[in-house]
Amino acid sequence: QVRLLLPGEVLRFDLSQERPRLCQRQRLATAPASEEDSLDEQLGETLERCRQTFRPCALLVSGGVDSNLLGSYLDPQLQRFHLCLEGDEESLLPHPRLQRFELRQEAFMPLLRRAVGNFGGATRMSSLLMYQRLADGIGEQGYHCVLLGEGADELFWGYPRHLELWRRRDAPEPRRFAAAWFGEYRRKAALLAEPAGRRVAERIEELAHEALGQGLEAAIGQFDLHYSLEPLLRRADHLLMSRTIEARTPYLHGALAQRAGRLQRIVGDTAKAPLVALLEQREKRWQAQPKRHFRLPFERWPQALGEMRRHLAERLPALHDLGLEGLDAPSVAALPGDQLFTLTTLSLWQQEYGASL
């Protein structure tokens, strides 16, 4: 029997016998964060709790705000890991214990097949491949616990869509709101046989309309949770756990979500303003950089694009069987990298799990 633990629930086991025995179930009352506690103090306390483990712990770092802010609280001797993409390297703050893992185009298809198998589904997140490479590298170094900056962009509004929606202040019509998360979803849905394609687009707009009925801020929170944060966490969990690595997410603990909602998250043209201000205060070497999305640089990876086009061209009959009747050789030759990736993961998923379908 599988029973989910509630937040704040503690189980105590007697390990003196051959088989562990549950001897106490306790629910800890968590006091709400004091308004007197600064964001600095609250994040530091949350990070300290997330670090509590008997295993060596490391931090995944990029050149962005979230991981660098976490790193400003940590011992300089704590291991840092970073993923370098061929043709798209990122500038990082110097650190004595920084190890880089490289991801090259030549590894694309074999690694993607493994990543799709571990993830267990099709996805548009090209970072799937990046997390598989990170998991392999971290696992080879013997680490089984890593700290991630996931959740900061959703809670503190760090994406370009947040700036765009907040500048207008008025609730947009459902199509424009949905496009902020799903892009040109009607064009993409046109690859499906009718009436499925039309129904998909209509359902997306129904969900956007229902969310906007709660107000713009609540709608953003709802779509961020279900269509951004949850998929990203599932990606991190499945790919890292393929190498028995636990992912810990300090920004999602310690009532930081409630505090984020009470702060002015966008100031002028600065997204994620409270975190940016805190990082500038704590890390004097930090210099603001344009937002970089954690995704593959398909515009610089022609070899990967070619591999996906060849794979899809060979798999057209199987994809037609899945309902993608609008997909043909000319469209495969013209599709952009992000859509090629989504369709390739669908094809690989069908190959990996076809016997069970």
Model-derived segments and their meaning:
Residues Q1-L59, N68-H95, Q99-R114:
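Active-site-adjacent "lid"/gating segments
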Residues V2, E9, D14-R19, E36-A58, ...:
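Peripheral terminal appendages
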Residues Q52-F54, I138-Y143:
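Glycine-rich phosphate-binding loop signature in dinucleotide/nucleotide-binding domains
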Residues G64:
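Conserved G/P- and acidic residue-centered "switch" motifs that form tight phosphate/ATP-binding loops
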Residues E86-I138, F156-D170, G213-G215, R262-I266:
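ATP-dependent adenylate-handling ligase core
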Residues G121-M125, R167, A211-D224, D269-T270, ...:
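Structural motif
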Residues E164-E184:
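Conserved phosphoryl-transfer catalytic core
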